[in-house]
Amino acid sequence: MVSAISEDSASATASGQCEVVKEELPAGNYILVAVEIDTTGRRLIDEIVQLAGYTSKGNFQQYIMPYMNLNQAARQRHQIRVISIGFYRMLKSMQTYKIIKSKSEVAALMDFLNWLETLLAKQPNKEGIVMLYHDDRKFIPYMILEALKKYSLIDRFNRSVKAFANTCPMAKTFLGKHGIKNCGLRKLSMLLAKSKDGNSTKEDEHENPEGNSSITDNSGHKNQKQGAFEGSANVRAKMVYEMALQLIESESTESPESFESPESSESSEAEVKLLNAVRPFSQLLSSTILELKDQNHSLGRQNSFRPVFLNYFRTTLNYRVRAVKYRIGLAEHGFTLKSLKAIWSDKRKPGLELVLTAIDSLKTEETAELLDLLDSYYDPSKTTIKPRCKRSGNGTRRRNRAKGAASSKNGAIGAGGDNSVPDSATKPGGRPRRKRNNIRNNILGPQNTEKGSPKAEMKTSTPKSMSIKPPSEFADI
């Protein structure tokens, strides 16, 4: 597959970056499949925990046992964690507290490819599959391709899947004119559900002009939405597909009164409309692979700046976020630690300033901070700038509280650290210890408490034997 990619689709820039030329998806008859994943984190080195796909003809869902554990944010987002029982690791749900059945990554990917090939086999008139995803960062296709690349399955994947289509920019284009800026999956689903419920209410009022009561069963729909956990990739895949269909149907109609849900319209017509709408926002698989390759090179350039921002990563979250932003901005423009050092050796600080002003993602004060940081790192006569962190008062209060508790035990202060409060109001030090029974005391018996009295001696003599006379009835025997 990689060898089949044309060299004209990428051109090398002066900075060493790989500029990907976007190729448009050719017109044809394709199957739309919404795909979602749950991962151990939000980095390319993380692993897939759950892989899910949804289409009008069926769905696919499989949990994957990762080699690494989920980070704290991923555990809270997906409500699953990795547990160890003896020598075995397994996934456990944090909602039901039950063990989740999972497979290895290669087995899950093979099942996913078999499912995609089965979809194409059932519809021989289709030319391929276009995968829908809703993500502003393009994280989902990169993670899927990274997993397929581990086991050399990209060629087989390319036989079925022709392109990836991102519904996030499509939603921003359609809803931007209405003043809607937040185009997250959850927000869009709520907006479209409200518009659908409002239109159904208007239709009921139009059908009952006399005011006759009409009962609509909205409780079942609400309970279904409430019971569906959006942290699961299986639920989100279905949400992506239904949201895209509803978005196209609402955009195709001019007035909200004529809104038609995808359930009432024919699925084939709705899918054709959706396919025509997502074509401008789709990207061929070859272009996505080249973008992934450039992302891996960008990560290598980011890691080269680690010595510069080492002090930033050792401080608070604010400085760590700024360090990540600076590294991404430098790496996206093709700079490395060695290339910036060559510029500094040639033109010193003015040369760095000329280069950093070309980064549009940085503000003026951020550019000045980054310039001073790089200049102090490259110049041996200067000390490297270290971020100044304001110490919060929590640690001081905690130490003072500990000191107060220690001094109160010594009886120097009263309750709450106030000398005017008597010590009788303070909490007692503890229960008086009860005297333990001493084995030696039991053996020696009561001791003489008078001063100068000799210690009691142990009684070793046995008591005198007592003669017992037999009863009279046994005397004649």
UniProtKB/Swiss-Prot annotation:
PANTHER family per UniProt: MATERNAL PROTEIN EXUPERANTIA
Protein name as catalogued: Maternal protein exuperantia-2
Function: Ensures the proper localization of the mRNA of the bicoid gene to the anterior regions of the oocyte thus playing a fundamental role in the establishment of the polarity of the oocyte. May bind the bcd mRNA.
A single GO BP: bicoid mRNA localization
Basic residues biased stretches: 385-402
Keywords, in A-Z order: Developmental protein, RNA-binding
Composition bias, Basic and acidic residues: 196-209
Gene (UniProt): exu2
Effect of residue 315 to A: In strain: ps4
InterPro entries hit by this protein: Exu, Exu_RNase_H-like, SAM_Exu
Pfam families: Exu_RNase_H_like, SAM_Exu
GO molecular function: protein homodimerization activity; RNA binding
UniProt region (Disordered), positions on chain: 196-226, 384-477
